Amino acid sequence: MMLRGGCQRVGARLRGLRRGPRGPADGARRGVVSCIDPSMGLSEEQKEFQKVAFNFAAREMAPHMAEWDQKELFPVDTMRKAAQLGFGGVYVQTDVGGAGLSRLDTSIIFEALATGCTSTTAYMSIHNMCVWIIDRFGSEEQRHRLCPPLCTMEKFASYCLTEPGSGSDAASLMTSAVRQHDHYILNGSKAFISGGGEADIYVVMCRTGGPGPRGISCVVVEKGTPGLSFGKKEKKVGWNSQPTQAVIFEDCAVPVANRIGDEGQGFLIAMKGLNGGRINVASCSLGAAHASIVLARDYLKVRKQFGEPLANSQYLQFQLADMAARLVASRLMIRTAATALQEEREDAIVLCSMAKLFATDECFAICNQALQMHGGYGYLKDYAVQQYVRDSRVHQILEGSNEVMRMLISRSLLQE
């Protein structure tokens, strides 16, 4: 379907726990309505593309996520298959190859995909954010030149904001772009760039003017441009199916025609991109948490101690119930924020901040508790739950750390 535009291992059932879930839609196949069913409240059309995303995650991602993690493989071919379903430009306009879906639709899709591989889906969410920036703020020439190969994921994109000396204080970035005739000469470096070295298009925030946010502009730097180079591939706790490298500019000449928007508009563009990025990464946390609950539930049914299944322990039952409640609460917050962002409401920024803060904190805690329920087995890389823990941890840091989310929320309250 194309989108619119113990002590012993217990046979096959326990082997399934090692591989990870084939998709949280397993309850639906048995005719059982799960209390954590992510399709509740969705339209029939949304349920259809959600099903497509879950099936893709189960067939094309979950069987390979451990290998991608352990061998640090960037699954280019798999992502291009996902792009054939419209997942390369989910909320990009259809005239440049996007699916033209809403922010809520996007959250639904990324949650489903993240059950198959959270790390890969998170990269795809960043790629989507970059394509949206070009689609939303670029000229018609830029949109039609750059977006189509990005929507098919023939080309990949990276978002370049963070620098070695400017993380949460993004407006203090130092990468300079000095205009010389019809080019900008870039000097500086970006840190922790997802897709660094592999991506073809780098959406770069750089300083064309004075200090502060108004001196920042946005330019597209294409791979192969003289003066563009990359640092070493970082060794990370999680997110190993996507490379992370520094992006370095040394007298890198970029055509002025590659500037997105006006001079001085870059910080605004960066922040508008991040509002959606926060919803996207929080949705990836939902997928990891959902998959972890399914794994924990199934493990509790299989694993026996003191002569009976762990599922008979009321303490563990209550923990599982709390995990389910926190998952559903997170999902509701994310979907509320996604709708506000789509409608361009005044409260969208703070709702996105709240959703990102709450969901990434709670979903990481869910994944971590699911690991604890597995006991010693949860600490083995044979079992998928540990990968969901590692891959979801960084969501509390990136796209604006959760401390910054608290700053934005409190500022909004105090200004009332």
From Swiss-Prot:
Its cofactor is FAD. The active site is at residue 399. It holds the Pfam family Acyl-CoA_dh_M. Disulfide bonds: none annotated. InterPro entries: Acyl-CoA_DH_CS, Acyl-CoA_Oxase/DH_mid-dom, Acyl-CoA_Oxase/DH_mid-dom_sf, AcylCo_DH-like_C, AcylCo_DH/oxidase_C, AcylCoA_DH/ox_N, AcylCoA_DH/ox_N_sf, AcylCoA_DH/oxidase_NM_dom_sf. It comes from the Eukaryota. FAD binds at residues 159-168, 192-194, 303, 313-314, 372-376, 401-403. This is Isobutyryl-CoA dehydrogenase, mitochondrial. Belongs to the acyl-CoA dehydrogenase family. One of its GO terms (biological process) is valine catabolic process. CDD domains: IBD (cd01162). GO terms for molecular function: flavin adenine dinucleotide binding; short-chain 2-methyl fatty acyl-CoA dehydrogenase activity. The gene is ACAD8. Homotetramer, formed by a dimer of dimers. Pathway: Amino-acid degradation; L-valine degradation. The modification N6-acetyllysine is found at residues 51, 232. SUPFAM superfamilies: Acyl-CoA dehydrogenase C-terminal domain-like, Acyl-CoA dehydrogenase NM domain-like. Its EC number is 1.3.8.5. Keywords: Acetylation, Branched-chain amino acid catabolism, FAD, Flavoprotein, Mitochondrion, Oxidoreductase, Transit peptide. One of its GO terms (cellular component) is mitochondrion.
